[in-house]
UniProtKB/Swiss-Prot annotation:
Family: Belongs to the major facilitator superfamily. DHA1 family. MdtH (TC 2.A.1.2.21) subfamily.
Organism lineage string: Bacteria, Pseudomonadati, Pseudomonadota, Gammaproteobacteria, Enterobacterales
HAMAP family on file: MFS_MdtH
Protein name per the record: Multidrug resistance protein MdtH
Pfam families hit by this protein: MFS_1
Main location: membrane
Spans traversing the lipid bilayer: 13-33, 34-54, 78-95, 99-116, 139-159, 165-185, 213-233, 243-263, 277-297, 299-319, 340-360, 365-385
Protein location: Cell inner membrane
Cited InterPro entries: MFS, MFS_dom, MFS_trans_sf, MFS_Transporters, Multidrug-R_MdtH
Keyword Cell inner membrane recorded: yes
PANTHER family per the UniProt record, alphabetical: MULTIDRUG RESISTANCE PROTEIN MDTH, RESISTANCE PROTEIN MDTM, PUTATIVE-RELATED-RELATED
Organism: Sodalis glossinidius (strain morsitans)
Topology within the bilayer: Multi-pass membrane protein
Family annotation (PROSITE patterns): MFS
GO-annotated molecular function: transmembrane transporter activity
Length: 405
């Protein structure tokens, strides 16, 4: 095995270990925020939605700057600093008793993610070949599902005692992740050239096709982020106890571990990436329409399972499409900007979802937010269809963008 191949092989094991710590640290805390502040403390869902949307918008919206810094400075210092900043945000969240404190803690957590997320994503592109990238994304997503359940179970158990313990556990996991990166991550350059930071950002903004694709995904993310806000609230309403939320993540893990990789392997041989993304989005939006009408917990979990199946179909294709369109001369900047759709979708999805939930309760129309989310998904589907019909997306190795290391 050549030294380059060995480095790629070891690097992928490192990425999996790092991803485990990050996902567990995140899911210990964030799925329980709406339960803690809306159900236990009685805050308006809009206030909590603003906090979650702020976190999403700052982390993903400023990702292009984090990516540009990583292109210039390398991945390691950005990742370590970002993980420590997120740990600090979690500590502050544990003592939040006013909305502004929750917003500040979410902002700190988001700034940490702005620093570590783009270089981590760029490392995946650097350490995988184009033809194996889709399968590696599937493995990461399977791991995400398993670790999210472990994190949510740990957080739910700790919430029975004190929310401060929930936040402390998340902070400790991110400190461990920072130490792990400081100890084992080499000083990789994540782009093929070391250009000025503004050059990488300009290169992204001039790429009209990439920009259009990223912004079109805003509606997709408005649906996907509801696993952190609206779905836990709805489960708690139907079940009457917050502990039932953990079963949502158990369903996700069971479906992902059993279906994600086989579906990815089967579909990549038969369907284009664009088709897989649109098919998954179709399943997601159809599953959301009736949720507000369901009062039986088993039926609700069946719809949530259908939503996750749609995500299982769509997510590997979405990630691979984004990587295929990225210019390797500015990997960090491209991966940072690719999160802008998530920033906008998260901010609108969280705050808008919380607002629609409050309005629906006030008007006694509980299905209002779910109908609107389904409609947004349908509009997004039409936008993607039109974009892909005009010009199908080809893998990066075929469209003239070299695969430098």
């Amino acid at each position: 095995m050549s030294s380059v191949s060995q480095a790629r092989s070891l690097g992928k094991y490192f990425l999996l270990m790092d991803n485990m710590l990050v996902v567990m640290g995140f899911y210990v805390v964030f799925p329980l925020i709406s339960i803690r502040f809306v159900d236990q403390l009685g805050w308006a869902a809009l206030l909590v939605g603003i906090a979650l949307g702020l976190r999403q918008f700052i982390q993903q919206g400023l990702g292009i700057f984090g990516g540009a810094f990583a292109d210039r400075l390398g991945a390691k210092p950005m990742i370590i600093a970002g993980m420590l900043m997120r740990a600090l945000g979690f500590v502050l969240m544990g003592i939040a008793d006013e909305p502004w404190l929750l917003w500040l803690s979410c902002a700190l957590s988001a700034l940490g993610g702005t620093l570590f997320d783009p270089p981590r994503t760029a490392l995946v592109i650097k350490l995988t070949r184009p033809w194996e990238r889709g399968r590696f994304y599937s493995l990461l997503m399977m791991q995400d599902s398993a670790c999210s359940v472990i994190g949510a179970l740990l957080g739910s158990w700790l919430l029975r005692y004190d929310f401060k313990l929930v936040c402390l556990a998340g902070a400790v996991l991110f400190v461990f992740a920072a130490i792990f990166n400081a100890w084992l991550l080499p000083g990789y350059r994540i782009s093929t050239v070391r250009a000025p930071m503004l050059e990488g950002m300009r290169r992204v903004l001039r790429d009209q096709r990439f920009v259009t694709y990223v912004l079109t995904l805003t509606g997709y993310y408005m649906l996907s982020v509801q696993v952190m806000l609206m779905l836990p609230i709805r489960i708690n309403e139907v079940a009457g106890q917050p502990a039932a939320v953990k079963w949502m993540y158990a369903i996700e893990a069971a479906l992902s571990l059993s279906l994600l990789y086989p579906i990815a392997r089967w579909s990549e041989k038969r369907f284009r990436l664009e088709t897989r993304l649109m098919a998954g989005l179709t399943v997601m939006l159809l599953s959301l329409f009736p949720i507000g009408l369901i009062e039986d917990l088993r039926a609700l979990f069946m719809l949530i399972g259908l939503f996750y199946i749609g995500s299982i179909i769509a997510e590997p294709a979405r990630e691979t499409l984004g990587a295929s369109l990225a210019d390797n001369r500015a990997r960090g900047s491209y991966m940072g900007f690719s999160r802008l759709g998530l920033a906008l979708g998260g901010a609108i999805g969280y705050s808008g979802g919380g607002w629609l939930y409050d309005v629906g309760n006030r008007l006694e129309i509980p299905q209002l937010p779910w109908f609107m989310l389904g409609l947004i998904g349908f509009i997004t589907l039409l936008g993607l269809y039109r974009q892909f019909q005009q010009r199908p997306i080809e893998p990066a190795m075929l469209n003239g963008r070299g695969e430098g290391s």
